[in-house]
Amino acid sequence: MVKIYAPASIGNVSVGFDVLGAAVSPIDGTLLGDCVSVTAAERFSLHNEGRFVSKLPDDPKQNIVYQCWERFCQEMGKEIPVAMVLEKNMPIGSGLGSSACSVVAGLMAMNEFCGQPLDKVTLLGMMGELEGRVSGSIHFDNVAPCYLGGMQLILEQEGYISQDVPGFSDWLWVMAYPGIKVSTAEARAILPAQYRRQDCITHGRNLAGFIHACHTQQPDLAAKMMKDVIAEPYRTQLLPGFAAARQAAQDIGALACGISGSGPTLFAVCNDQATAQRMAGWLQNHYLQNDEGFVHICRLDTAGARLLG
């Protein structure tokens, strides 16, 4: 039996729309991500369990893990009879890379079970393709950090898809999911087709400055560069309470605050435990909208997807 855990991820990280992503894991050891296990069987089967199992499609063939198995078998040129179990711990439409977690765990579990016939670049390419079936377009800003860990800059050049960006070990990422769903397609549709030149210049400066600050280990500069002029000004209207949360983050002393992916999850970056706890407390009391919501204090997950058994 092979069991894979794939962690949650922050798409865009405010400053890198569609080209930057970061994997995160709670500091208390909670598994914030999906697990997929694979065992030998006479015929294929897929069983779903976990906290958010009720949100999965009724038709098994619409389940992205079924599609992972199907795509992997296609790549291998044969049908591989296995029993798969998806442990769905991630809310769907949350902005935490939920579909990426299932895709990464599903494909990596199949690859490990079969003795790693596919290399990482090939597997990551397939992950992006399958993620595209869910979100409507191939993009790697969730699957790359989820699979490889840490912060990943999506380059798609010279035979590789992404490269690692060094993070800051003392940063704490407070993640708050309010318990409502935002459609990725809707969140993309709300964005303008064209941008003003000044916004393009600001975006380029912020992203270049952030990547430079990460590589030269300047956390204050990196935090100042974490501004989103591409998506956040337009998506705020889809996220009740986000503007108030961003103001609270500033008042509490967070270094930065932004939308995780297309939302509704937000993240706030803090550089000490006391600030992170205050931020988490505020979000717990003011940003969550129902019992499905949660807040976690996280660090960058530098390991990425990994074997649990």
From Swiss-Prot:
Annotated localization: Cytoplasm
One example GO MF annotation: ATP binding
GO terms under biological process: threonine biosynthetic process
Domain of life, source organism: Bacteria
Main location, first listed in the record: cytoplasm
Pfam families for this protein: GHMP_kinases_C, GHMP_kinases_N
Pathway involvement of the protein, from the record: Amino-acid biosynthesis; L-threonine biosynthesis; L-threonine from L-aspartate: step 4/5
SS bond list: none
Function (record text): Catalyzes the ATP-dependent phosphorylation of L-homoserine to L-homoserine phosphate.
Family of the protein in this entry: Belongs to the GHMP kinase family. Homoserine kinase subfamily.
Entry protein name: Homoserine kinase
Native source species: Yersinia pestis bv. Antiqua (strain Nepal516)
Gene: thrB
